[in-house]
C-alpha cells in the first residue's frame, strides 16, 4: 500500500513538472530548491525554540508571535535580493543562453543580486577628514558573499585540475609512461588537499579565530577539548606577551591551570620553567606524550561515535536489516577513528615538535624554545593532523577535501574589504561558476560529489 502511495506521489510530481515549459524547468527547480534550503532550517529552528520554551516555561511567547515570525521567514525568502532569486537567476541565465558565456554573465548578475543587499554587519561609521573638519559617515564594506565565491573557486579548480590530470593520464598510459610517481600523486592528491586545508584551519583556530565562522570555532573547541588558558598562553607566546626567562607578569595564567591539574606551580612560570613541561599541555594525563596522544584518541573516538552512530542508524532505519545495521556501525567506527586520529595527531605533533624534534633542530636556548612554543610546535600539529583522512575510503577523502578547502581559503582573505574591490570577487565567482556549469553540461561526471549530482538534476532537461 505504501509503495502505491509513493508511486502516486511521484507520478503527481512528474505531471506537475511536465506542465512547466521545458526551458523554464531548471529555473523553477533552482528557485524551489533555494527557497527550501534558505527557509526550512530557520522554520525548524523556530519550531524547536517554540517547543522548548513551552516545555520549559521560559519567556513563554504567544502562539501568534511565533506564527508571525514563521510568516516573516517565508515572506523573506520570496524577496528579490535573497538566495532563491539568486539560484533562479544563475541557473536561468546559464540554461537560457549559450553555455560558458551565458553562465559567466548569469553568475555575475546573480552574485550582484546578493551583494546589493546592505547588511549592518558590513556597515561601519568611519571618521573622514573634510574641509569643514572631521565627519562621521557610514561606510559599506564588501565580503558578504566571500564564502560562496571561495566555494565556487574551489570547485572550478577541482574541475580544471581533475580534467588536466585525466588527459595527462590518458596520454601517458597510451605511451607506456604512467609511472609509480604518477600513481602516488593520484592517490595522495585528495588527502594532501584535506591535510593542507586542515593545517590552515587549525592554525587559524589557535592564532586568528576571528577568521573562522563562529560555529566552526565552537565545533573545533568541543572536539579538541582544550583548556582555554592554554590557548591564551600560546597566543601570548607568539605575540611576545610571554617570554622565556623574562618576568612579564604572565605566570598566574598557567599557574592557575597547574593548580587545577595537580602540577607544581613553577611549571606555569616562564622564568622558572624553560620550556613549559609537556605535562601542562597534557592537562592532567601524565608525562608521557605517546600516552597522552592515545588517551586523546580514545576520548575523541567515543565522543564522535556517540554522535555518528545514532545519525547513521536513523539513516539506515529506512531499510532496517542486519546488513544495514552492520554498515551503520562500521561507517560510524571508521569516521570516529578518523576524527580520533585527527585530534591525536594534532596533539602529538605539538609534543613531537616541542620535546623531540624541535630542540635537536633549533637548539635549547631561551630564544629557540621561544620560537618553538611561539608557533613552530603548533605548525607541527597542523602539518600532521589532516593525514588522518587516509583512514577514510577514497571517495570520502575527496568529499572531505572539497568540504574544508573553501573554509581554509577563507582564512587567507579578509572577511570585509572595500567596496571598490568587489569586482574582483565577482569576476572570480563568475569565471568559476561558468567553468563548473559548462562542465556539468559537457562532462557531468567531472563535477564530483553531491554538488555534481545536484547540478545535473537541476540543469538537466
Q: Where are the regions a protein language model picked out?
A:
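Glycine-rich, hydrophobic membrane-spanning regions of integral membrane proteins that mediate transport
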Residues: 1-461
Amino acid at each position: 500500500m505504501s509503495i502505491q502511495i509513493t508511486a502516486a506521489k511521484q507520478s503527481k510530481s512528474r505531471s506537475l513538472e511536465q506542465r512547466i515549459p521545458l526551458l523554464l524547468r531548471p529555473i523553477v527547480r533552482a528557485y524551489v530548491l533555494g527557497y527550501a534550503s534558505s527557509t526550512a532550517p530557520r522554520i525548524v529552528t523556530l519550531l524547536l525554540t517554540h517547543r522548548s520554551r513551552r516545555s520549559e516555561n521560559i519567556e513563554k511567547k504567544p502562539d501568534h508571535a511565533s506564527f508571525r515570525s514563521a510568516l516573516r521567514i517565508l515572506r523573506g525568502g520570496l524577496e528579490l535580493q535573497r538566495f532563491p532569486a539568486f539560484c533562479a537567476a544563475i541557473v536561468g541565465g546559464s540554461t537560457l543562453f549559450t553555455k560558458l558565456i551565458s553562465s559567466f554573465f548569469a553568475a555575475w548578475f546573480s552574485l550582484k543580486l546578493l551583494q546589493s543587499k546592505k547588511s549592518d554587519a558590513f556597515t561601519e561609521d568611519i571618521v573622514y577628514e573634510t574641509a569643514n573638519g572631521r565627519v562621521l559617515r557610514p561606510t559599506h564594506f564588501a565580503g558578504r558573499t566571500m564564502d560562496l565565491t571561495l566555494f565556487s573557486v574551489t570547485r572550478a579548480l577541482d574541475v580544471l585540475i581533475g580534467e588536466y590530470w585525466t588527459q595527462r593520464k590518458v596520454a601517458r598510459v597510451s605511451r607506456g609512461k604512467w609511472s609509480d610517481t604518477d600513481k602516488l600523486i593520484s592517490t595522495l592528491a585528495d588527502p594532501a588537499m584535506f591535510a593542507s586545508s586542515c593545517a590552515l584551519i587549525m592554525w587559524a583556530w589557535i592564532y586568528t579565530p576571528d577568521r573562522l565562522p563562529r560555529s566552526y570555532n565552537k565545533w573545533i573547541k568541543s572536539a579538541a577539548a582544550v583548556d582555554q588558558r592554554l590557548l591564551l598562553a600560546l597566543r601570548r607566546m607568539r605575540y611576545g606577551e610571554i617570554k622565556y626567562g623574562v618576568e612579564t607578569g604572565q605566570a598566574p595564567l598557567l599557574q592557575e591551570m597547574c593548580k587545577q591539574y595537580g602540577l607544581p606551580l613553577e611549571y606555569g612560570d616562564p622564568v622558572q620553567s624553560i620550556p613549559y613541561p609537556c605535562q601542562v599541555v597534557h592537562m592532567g594525563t601524565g608525562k608521557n606524550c605517546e600516552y597522552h596522544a592515545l588517551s586523546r584518541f580514545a576520548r575523541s573516538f567515543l565522543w564522535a561515535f556517540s554522535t555518528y552512530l545514532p545519525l547513521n542508524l536513523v539513516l539506515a532505519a529506512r531499510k532496517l536489516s542486519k546488513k544495514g545495521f552492520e554498515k551503520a556501525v562500521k561507517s560510524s567506527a571508521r569516521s570516529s577513528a578518523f576524527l580520533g586520529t585527527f585530534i591525536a595527531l594534532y596533539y602529538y605533533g605539538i609534543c613531537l615538535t616541542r620535546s623531540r624534534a624541535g630542540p635537536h633542530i633549533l637548539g635549547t636556548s631561551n630564544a629557540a624554545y621561544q620560537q618553538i612554543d611561539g608557533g613552530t610546535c603548533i605548525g607541527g600539529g597542523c602539518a600532521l593532523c589532516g593525514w588522518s583522512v587516509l583512514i577514510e575510503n577514497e571517495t570520502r577523502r575527496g568529499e572531505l577535501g572539497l568540504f574544508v578547502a573553501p573554509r581554509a581559503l577563507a582564512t587567507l582573505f579578509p572577511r570585509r574589504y572595500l567596496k571598490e574591490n568587489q569586482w574582483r570577487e565577482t569576476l572570480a565567482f563568475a569565471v568559476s561558476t561558468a567553468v563548473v556549469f559548462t562542465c556539468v553540461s559537457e562532462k557531468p561526471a567531472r563535477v564530483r560529489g553531491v554538488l555534481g549530482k545536484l547540478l545535473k538534476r537541476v540543469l538537466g532537461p
